[in-house]
Amino acid sequence: MNAAASLFSADNPGLPALGLVQLWLHLGWGTLLAWLGVRMGTRLGLQPRAAWVLASALMVWAWLPGPYAPVHWLGLAFQGPSVMAVLLCAVDLVWRRTGSGRFREGPSFWSGAWLAAGVLLGWALLLDTLALLPVSLYAWGFNAAVPALLVLLALLPWVLQGGSARQHSMSVLVVAVFAVYVALHLPTGNVWDALLDPWLWLYLNARAVRAGFAGRRGVLP
């Protein structure tokens, strides 16, 4: 009992430096806004060059000082985005720009498993916020042992299925998220905040609903 309590203890959490938090607000939200710019431009039928100009303008706007930038208000309302959301958007932007295709989750079973894991984690954290769980799940996210356990779980699809890193992009991406978190403790010092944020969770729920109606599991757009 004492060993288990020690394993998941949240004493002495590693918190990010204040300067890094401010930098992450601009970099993180700027990346998400740029991704939204490309997506909106594509949906509106803009030429690729025009869509990328829109994305670049949104990224520059995110770096304006004080209340002139959307980051100021987004940070007040939502703090910084998750490392997962930022890396997903950044990878998708790079692949769209280079013509390498869209970000793929791997074999269909694991695509569904990753999607379900994100949705269920969000619901569990919501229940924890409402004090409806017998344990404090969010507090576990401050413990240094939890990321190591989650890395092992993230590599499980790759170990069981084999194949290249490209075939298991999500496993690689999740490990990258943990690497950023362990090195910098972004965005809040809690590993759950590095993996998931409210906007990403809502997006995953929408994807799950759409996949359910379509009767298939797909790729992250």
For each of these PLM feature ranges, what is it?
Residues V159-V172, Y181-A194:
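Membrane-helix boundary connector in multi-pass membrane proteins
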Residues M1-S82:
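N-terminal topogenic module of multi-pass integral membrane proteins
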Residues R216-P221:
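Short, charged juxtamembrane terminal tails flanking transmembrane helices
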Residues S82-Q161:
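Membrane-proximal helix-loop-helix units in multi-pass membrane proteins
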Residues W24-G37, G80-T98, P147-V159, W199-G215:
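Hydrophobic cores of alpha-helical transmembrane segments in multi-pass inner/ER membrane proteins
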Residues W63-V71, L126-S136, V182-G189:
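Juxtamembrane "helix-exit" motif on the non-cytosolic side of transmembrane helices
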Residues V71-Q79, E105-P107, S136-A145, N190-L200:
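Non-cytosolic membrane-interface motifs at loop->transmembrane helix junctions
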Residues A51-M59, H168-V182:
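Central hydrophobic cores of alpha-helical transmembrane segments
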